[in-house]
């Protein structure tokens, strides 16, 4: 059983209330208009759940990873795009929290707690799963000049602060990668298109173009060449957050399918009384609960500092939860029949949203590779 203290329960109840009263009524419109919900960002910030992982000295609440996973889950039950805003904020913030100097943390982290947005920029057109093939390069020492291109960057064009990875010494391979903090409006930074996506349409994904992007040395995160450890630590937590999002999305789809089955009458009775429907819902519920428990266990390992278990369990949680969400949302559409396929009902949106979670933060095939390597230690 998961035991939360009174304060944690209050925070989680606040997240559930925001999901129910603020996010859910906006979810369909956000998806239809492909609209970034600034109003929801403001509500998240006002209630302390935009950056809950931050220590109190930087404006956060010092939440555990388990509590943050539960917050993401609550929001994702009604709108996966809005949950992705929380995830992207954490993804962009954590490289600074994990590796930044005290001065860098004091400069940027409090603003993120108040509503400024962050982004995590590693992926490139030719460097997705194979991140070491990135082509973004730097030169200089006191002032760095960075050139290259990033793509599919969540929050990219709206972020005030970007944690960006580049090679400072390509000849060193993984040991030649360094992260930097890039500010919106920096000289040499420009934006391409915001992607037109199948799902998660309330979240912005952008191209970033870097042409002799000027970054002062004090905006380097950690020492030169230490970026791969920072990158992998951040990716592990990204995968945990994606798993929590998938669990919430699956639970939201179950809730919709159950409510529909109780009121939909066919053959003179609610379809909830049909064994075939009961079997489908039972499988959906069991799969989601299993994914939830694995996700919570991964979060606990992070909270407990069991670093040797984190990569494997975060990867397992991510692929199990997202595969479950894809299956559950598909079955929710099936339970609701023709109505489930219509945009008048949220399970249509949920099914489209679920697909991305099998892809981002590392495809589920790569996640299985990570787990296999951890098991065999190769």
What are these regions, as identified by a protein language model?
Residues 114-123:
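A short, Trp-centered hydrophobic/proline-enriched beta-strand micro-motif
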Residues 136-140:
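A structural signal for short hydrophobic beta-strand segments in well-ordered beta-sheet cores
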Residues 212-230:
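Long, acidic (Asp/Glu-rich), low-complexity accessory segments flanking structured domains
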Residues 143, 147-191:
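A short core secondary-structure module
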Residues 126-129, 152-155, 169-171, 197-204:
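Short Gly/Pro-enriched turn/cap motifs at secondary-structure boundaries
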Residues 1-82, 87, 99-104, 115, ...:
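Alpha-helical interface subdomain recognition
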Residues 133-135, 187-216:
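Flexible, small-/acidic-enriched active-site or ligand-binding loops
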Residues 122-124, 150, 166-168, 181-184, ...:
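Short, structured patches in soluble enzyme cores that scaffold and shape functional sites
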